[in-house]
């Protein structure tokens, strides 16, 4: 498919990252297939997660098509850009339309980005996952790439005033080894494996993060931070 919008948007995003002076650490990019479909299953801690994960995938030579809620597509500014970059609109009132669209994109060799938690985790821990990532991988016969973003919550997240002037924040994006699920796999077992893998990756990323989590609003209670405790 033609990508006339994605390249200039990426250029603008890179300028924004440069303005913020973000210190990137991209790990495991080699796990993203250079061709063919794949599902990036990404944790969700802030409003910039999609742009950061998309940026981290660029060294693999891939543009990620994100599944995003309809409200973004309805926005007069963001909507045309989202459609121009061939992202996938998720309209909860339209049943399976978004799932079918994502399945079609995967079968045509696209990389799809999905946030299986559904919404931002205000505790910055990984919540229960929905089964969409596993079901898409099973249906299209493609791998799931567990993906962790850490640091984005320090810039802009839910229930906290955004700080786009914050400078030199370390940002980690880690891609894990691919998980494969055939069409006869147990969906619930697959979802459990995916969540356990993402939790393990998150803990490893946090352990190696250069800044201290102690006493920070952007850090989970488990690490001595003062973010809201998980509900479950």
Regions found by a protein language model. Give the residues of each.
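Short, basic, glycine/proline-bearing loop/turn elements
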Residues: 13-15, 83-89, 116-120
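Hydrophobic/aromatic ligand-binding patch that stacks against planar heteroaromatic rings
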Residues: 56, 81, 104, 135-139
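Catalytic core of membrane glycerolipid acyltransferases/transacylases, capturing the structured
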Residues: 20, 33-94
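Membrane-interfacial terminal anchoring regions of lipid-handling membrane enzymes
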Residues: 1-19, 23-34, 104-107, 152, ...
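A cross-family acyltransferase "interaction/gating" segment
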Residues: 124-186, 220-221, 228-229
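Catalytic-site beta-strand/loop segments enriched in glycine and acidic/polar residues
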Residues: 105-133
């Amino acid at each position: 498919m033609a990508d006339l919008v994605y390249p200039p948007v990426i250029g603008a995003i890179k300028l924004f990252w440069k303005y913020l002076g973000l210190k990137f650490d991209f790990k495991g990019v080699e796990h993203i297939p250079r061709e063919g479909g794949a599902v990036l299953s990404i944790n969700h801690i802030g409003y910039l997660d999609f742009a950061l994960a998309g940026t981290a995938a660029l060294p693999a030579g891939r543009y990620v098509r994100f599944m995003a809620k309809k409200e973004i597509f309805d926005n007069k500014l963001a909507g045309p850009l989202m459609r121009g970059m061939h992202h996938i609109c998720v309209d909860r009132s339209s049943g399976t339309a978004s799932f079918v669209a994502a399945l079609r994109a995967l079968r045509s060799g696209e990389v799809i980005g999905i946030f299986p938690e559904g919404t931002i985790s205000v505790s910055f821990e990984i919540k229960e996952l929905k089964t969409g990532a596993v079901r898409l991988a099973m249906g299209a016969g493609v791998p799931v790439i567990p993906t962790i973003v850490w640091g984005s919550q320090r810039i802009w997240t839910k229930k906290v005033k955004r700080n786009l002037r914050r400078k030199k924040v370390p940002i980690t994006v880690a891609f894990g080894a691919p998980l494969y699920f055939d069409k006869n796999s147990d969906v619930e077992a697959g979802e459990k494996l995916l969540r356990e893998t993402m939790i393990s990756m998150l803990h490893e990323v946090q352990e190696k993060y250069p800044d201290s989590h102690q006493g920070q609003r952007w850090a989970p209670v488990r690490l001595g931070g003062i973010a809201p405790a998980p509900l479950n």
